[in-house]
Amino acid sequence: MADTEQGYDPKVQVKETGPQVHTLELLSTDAELKGSSFQRGIAVLGRVFGIVSGVEARGIERVADDERQAPAPNTYTRIFLLWLSSALTGNNIIVGLYGPSLYGLDWSQATICATLGVILGISILTWFIATLGVHLFQFYTRYAWIIQILTLAIMIGSAGPSFITSPFLSPDIPRATVSDRLSFFSLCFASAITWAPASADYFVYFPTATKSWRMFLAGSTGMSLAMALTTILGIGLATGIDSNQAWIEASLASPGSLLAASFSNLHGFGRFCAVILLLGTVSNNIPCTYSAGLNLQMLGRYGPRIPRPLLTTLEVVIYTVCAIVAREYLREIMENFLPLMSYWIVAWLALCLEEAWIFRRGRDYDWAIWNNPNRLPMGLAAGASFVFGILGAVLGMSQSYFVGPIANALPQKCDLGMWLAFGFTAVVYPAFRCAELRVVGR
């Protein structure tokens, strides 16, 4: 994690403007504000925006202990509900559709792969919550799950009778192979593990005395229940497509149309439920958008000077335009882009795990040096290992646009990119890191 924070100016400090509003200033040794007119203007804009609106303007800077929330009885319940609400959304149902429709798995095969993949991915990402670990968002997630789970329960009642839970879907569909099971398992794992890099962003205001193991249980339970439920619902919808003409036509239009068709038995009320299910994806978009603003601030030493709300607004405009333009290609995007994201995330994951348990041996980070590049690792070992990990991903990937030589050499094509990316990175990082420590000393 420290490698990603290299490059920050040690003179960027936090200036208090109120109990919950924080902005960034570039301070010189004589406490005079320096920089270009644009930089000063951005800093002033951030302060004014935070004071007038009350919106959290804090960026990537460390939250001091005296600014954190006091311990409360519902702390771990809030963690549980945040992840439950974030994953109990329609887009995770779409992941489940691909088990029967893309890989030819029946109900039991797809359900086992999905549940195991989701739980494994969630367990790993919540390790980051417990180890590293937004006021309005947290308030929203305390209650959003109620509406979302009621809507999903209505979907089960409406569409459940059409689910085919028999061992084999149809004699016309080829039997699923081991490679199909592994590919779908990897897809479900990828849908969960993609939360890992951002998983600590939402609990920075929690007290430092928060128990890691309780955070792990709360986070993993909430996310696992939500993602397992929604993915299995998607599997059920996919198994019933061939026996329902309306579902066939809807699935040819888009995955979203299939979700709406699952409520068709309820007529007007069903259309209302479909709208509620669609609006529920807000719970999934909020944390992603929040974290993306922090990620943009980490791109360079000047990033923290741009207010996070301004970056967030820019992101929303960009991804809204992209969503409108690409709305007809959601299936292709989910099939191709989700595994691609998992390649770099598992390589990053291998770096973090080995740094934490081999070189730091479970010891905490020195958070006081988070923005001091002279004391942080240079990232040479991490960068070189990451390149090896991506090489492994390229060799083992099996996508519609490219099949790696290792995947192509298998009797049955299977996407091994994620597993090879993790393996290649994990093998070379210890040697590279030892060399970096010996030569550089940090």
Residue spans for each PLM region:
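Membrane-interface "cap" regions at the ends of multi-pass membrane proteins
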Residues: 2-98, 105-107, 179-186, 204-216, ...
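Hydrophobic, small-residue-rich membrane helices and short re-entrant helix-turn-helix hairpins
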Residues: 70-76, 132-145, 177, 194-229, ...
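Hydrophobic, membrane-embedded alpha-helices of multi-pass small-molecule transporters
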Residues: 76-93, 156-162, 173-240, 264-289, ...
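Transmembrane alpha-helical segments of multi-pass small-molecule transport proteins
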Residues: 111-131, 146-156, 191-199, 304-325
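Membrane-interface loop-to-helix entry segments
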Residues: 120-159, 217-219, 338-345
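Loop-to-transmembrane helix boundary motifs in multi-pass membrane proteins
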Residues: 121, 298-332, 373-393
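Hydrophobic alpha-helical segments and their helix-loop junctions in multi-pass secondary transporters
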Residues: 126, 130, 147-173, 188-193, ...
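C-terminal membrane-solvent junction of multi-pass transporters and transport-like membrane proteins
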Residues: 348-428
